[in-house]
């Protein structure tokens, strides 16, 4: 009978272990479909475990607890294989009842995650921790069929993602294709984020553990729940916040390193931006990255900050002795090797770092305020730049308009002077023509009188043929003189018409001058407004010099034009006089042929007298013209000198006026600065008094808080001890109840009694030593409860086996 019971017990125990590993638990047929799928995944994972040599040794071990003398011997003899088997079974039970574990907020889950998730369970646990849904997996198939605008960029960056990993080495291989599909699908899923280079390393780490659909679902949850999508947006607002928080944490927890970084100009973004964008996948190896991802999915972004501080603390002694370039090389090459040398120590250091959530939120608020101020300042700066550009354009337009109006004014003055000169010349010519007309009319009257006298002589005396010929010649001369008088009359009429035209032009020029004067007045008003704006001394000086140079240039051009016109007039008059002299000589020669000797003598004497008279008149005219030109040149030179002196006086007066205004402004600013300094000193004294009062209040409040904290910690410790005591009592009562209900199973009862005795002995020993911390005792009690639950399951299986044998 004893032989059959022992064999059935051992077979039942092994069957129970296999059921736990395979996911076949009691009541499996009543589970929903989602849990059935989870159990199927666990079975697939267990098959992979059985293929491993270590796991096979642990699974097919023939060691049984009932063959051991005491429970203490069984616990120590199991070794690493039993501990690994316990981890596997613990994860299997947690995954079987994942929702229940989350509802109870089982602390064992986070503790197990910190120890490291087994490789074969990692894919399922990551999905459960991230909360990946089936809806994202269904959308993945639709996204693969679509096309993305980022495909070329993704293809370019895939070859640079995990180049040392065998799965991603082959070009256009299954690894690279899977990586491309997942990244493309997420770029279509979240079009605001699209594609960022750092996301490829996170996707590659997920694809090393799970298929494409599951990796896509986990990636979506990572981006949404842990605010990673804000880090990959084009603005990268979350990355800036993380850098600001990390810099403040380094300043608070590692102040000497922060001072060294500030002295070397080593910004936080130079070494930490890739840590947060890729979750340390580009810095550490794959195994360490997987463990960081385990805790990141469980605890969130806070653990990434802890890892960053742990890395800085690991290399602190070396970093304090390096410059900026050497620090960059150290972060890239030496620091990962130091972490890999002591992985558990590194993670324990990271777990030991404490972060205050209130302080982190306060830093986030400070960063948002800083960003808001920066945006306001940038908006104000952009507005001022736009206004400055508009003012510059307006100033340039006003300068161009003023220059154009000044040019127009100068041109108007020049044209007016030219018109005055032309009108003066026309008037002088008109006066000359009138004089010549009077002379010619007087000569015509004399000629008419001579004709009358000659006609009377012809009637009285009959002269010879020679006299008739002479009369005919005199008549011809008179006809020629009449023709010359007619030509002069025509010239006078033409000159009168030209005079009318010139007067019309003068009227038009006067109208233009009025318009120009009105514009000049407007320009003077604009100049007054511009002068009131108080430009810089250099600009004002240049403007004054420009106006003066333009006026000088205009005056010089006017004088040059006047001189040219005078020279042309003199040359034209000289040529005209030469032509008239030649014409008169030719007429004299023609008349001399037909005239008598007596007339020739009289004509010769008359011509000599007239030529002498004309020469004298010409000489006097030339001398007067030359004197007039000399006086005009002297007058213009004097005017230029006067203009220069006036401009210099105006420039000097403007400079003196501006200097006086600047002096007044400087005095006012000095007085304002003195008053401000006094106000600021008074405010500083008030602030110092307030600061001292606040400091004293803060010290009092801090002492009160410390006292309250110690009291609360004492009450918490007492409550924890009470909870642990009640839990141990509960476990003892449950064990005693099971023992009373199952008195037939003698072997199991003995084992349980031995275990209870050992536990009681341990409890008494701990109490006697005084080492009874709440958290450790609670965890040990939980482990003991779990082990007793497993033993109770074994006991139920034994019961079933005995009933089957009896039937």
UniProtKB/Swiss-Prot annotation:
What InterPro entries does the entry give? Rab-GAP-TBC_dom, Rab-GAP_TBC_sf, Rab_GAP_TBC_domain
Q: Name one GO cellular component term.
A: vesicle
GO biological process terms on file: regulation of cell migration; regulation of protein localization
* Sequence positions bearing Phosphoserine: 58, 64
Q: Answer whether the UniProt record assigns the keyword Coiled coil to this protein.
A: yes
Record keywords? Coiled coil, Cytoplasm, Endosome, GTPase activation, Phosphoprotein
Q: Which residues form a coiled coil?
A: 352-463, 494-583, 627-772
What Pfam families does its record include?
RabGAP-TBC
Q: Which residues form the Rab-GAP TBC domain?
A: 116-300
Carrying Phosphothreonine, the residues are 33
GO MF terms held by the record: GTPase activator activity; small GTPase binding
Which SMART domains does the protein's record reference?
TBC
Where this protein primarily resides, as one coarse class?
A: cytoplasm
Ranges for region Disordered: 1-31
For the keyword Transmembrane, the answer is: no
Recorded superkingdom = Eukaryota
What's the subunit arrangement here? Interacts with Rab11.
PANTHER family for the chain? RAB GTPASE-ACTIVATING PROTEIN 1-LIKE, RAB-GAP TBC DOMAIN-CONTAINING PROTEIN
Biological function: Functions as a GTPase-activating protein (GAP). During border cell migration in the ovary, acts as a GAP for Rab11 and is necessary for the maintenance of active receptor tyrosine kinases at the leading edge.
The identity of this protein, by name, is Ecotropic viral integration site 5 ortholog
Gene behind the chain: Evi5
